[in-house]
Amino acid sequence: MKIRAAVLVAPGRYEVQTFDRPKLEDGALLMRVELSGICGTDKHTYQGETKQYAGTESETDTPFPIIQGHENVGIIEELSPALEESGDFYQAPVKVGDRIVMCPDMICGKCFYCTHIQGYSWCSKSQCYGNSFTSAQWPHLLGGWAEYMYFKPGTFFYKVPENIPPKVAVLAELMACAASLDKLKDFSSYSIEGFTTGDTVVVFGVGPLGLLHLAKLGIMGAGKIICFDKSDYRLELAKKFGADLTINVDKT
């Protein structure tokens, strides 16, 4: 079986390449990709900004050629026996044909940050699907801009409820970025800083990430929500997502 992928062979240059279907390691799976988002990081890499995790202990250079895509949803095509037993991140049973989403970062579980604090965001050896793995080496298919994607052993993934369509599930990774609001609310529980119920909040920019932060703010009980952007179209969407006041900065 040959699998096609959009490969970024160098900044500014994509090629459609084909790869053999990889044989699964124990603890791995193969996902048929339904949708994969285009992140700002993908654009920067295409433009030649090739530092990943810049300024952190995980800083690396993008290993071209690479298959991008870390905002992914798809259907389990093949599942190793180990995962049939262990299930997804929450140990929910999974099988071939189930829809899943993934955490794009792979953490080591052994560094100071992994063993002393919530390691997912801070791991000093973090690697990211679509950003950290070259397609020149087996198993090749380590990004979502391909017909199929390989999940290495240790990848966090989640079964998607049947009532959630792929066009919504693909936003899971973006929504996870709104976890910063959870941290801010945590801070407010033991200091006067942070964010708490009823606070007025300003959102600068209402692209996909801004809109999902806006949705999360509504869920968390924000008071007045004010949004700034240059696009009237996006500001209209922001109103539908619950913004109380929208301001076009180019018209102010």
Can you annotate each of these PLM segments?
Residues 197-206, 218-252:
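Adenosine-nucleotide cofactor-binding segment
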Residues 44-51:
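Short Gly/aromatic-enriched secondary-structure transition segments
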Residues 2-4:
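Extreme N-terminal starter segment of soluble prokaryotic enzymes
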Residues 22-36, 51-115, 141-142, 161-163:
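Glycine-rich beta-strand-centered segment in the early N-terminal region that forms part
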Residues 177, 209, 217:
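Hydrophobic/small residue at the entry helix of a nucleotide-binding pocket
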Residues 58-65, 70, 86-88, 108-204:
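NAD(P)H dinucleotide-binding glycine-rich loop of Rossmann-like/cofactor-binding domains
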